Amino acid sequence: FCSLAPIHASVGSYNNHWGVPLSLARMPEQSRYGVFEVGMNHAGEIAPLSDLVKPHVALVLNVLPAHIGQLGSLEAIRQEKLDIRRGLQKNGVLVMPYDLERSDIDDVRILTFGFDSSADVSAVMRLRDDSMSVEVTIDDKDYQYELSICGEHLVLTSVAVIAVAYALGADIAKAVSDMTMLNSPKGRGNLLSVSGRVVIDDSYNANPVSMIHAIKALSQRAAGSRIAILGEMLELGEFSDELHK
């Protein structure tokens, strides 16, 4: 969005009841777009933060078993994350994965994204030696771009960003062309060259699904020795032993 208009965005993990108000307070008056991360690790935290932000477009990127120890189930996590729509402005848009249950949502406009061809913003990806090739389809029009990041989940994140741009009425061709400059934050699937070896650094955080994505990304690399160094996954509560297995 930086090339489309003046923008302000949350830094780091400023996504809680301290970070969101601080990010809002720091937003320059001339900003046309504001991007705010809203997070939670307990029930009832998303809606109040969304009410503060009052977004025109709200994005639910995924529903994973992170914090399942506190919320108890994936369904509880889904409901909590979808509460981000509570703060949407009139005629606002909820952007969400195509394969996420949405039959109980009838109070906002929904825009879906995903690898399913029935999604409003659908994508096909192809693995190359050192990049991912992505083709996105919106309103029967195709857009293509390359990503120098590794992992299906990171490709899906880029598709979600394009869906948000579409929901905002932004220049899609420009947004797609800017995807080639996308780099993952440190520890989020970065490709590193160390002593002639390729290292995939996905060390920022871990939950069962993100761990599976990381291992899948490793398995898709070119033939040769593959070594996975895995840490523990936290905040899984009573499900910890089962999910680690």
Residue ranges, per PLM feature:
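Beta-strand->loop->alpha-helix junctions that form or flank phosphate-binding loops
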Residues: 13, 98, 108-129, 146-152, ...
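Solvent-exposed alpha-helices and their adjacent loops that cap or buttress functional pockets
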Residues: 26-29, 50-53, 85-88, 116, ...
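Nucleotide phosphate-binding/pyrophosphate-handling subdomain across enzymes
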Residues: 48, 140-245
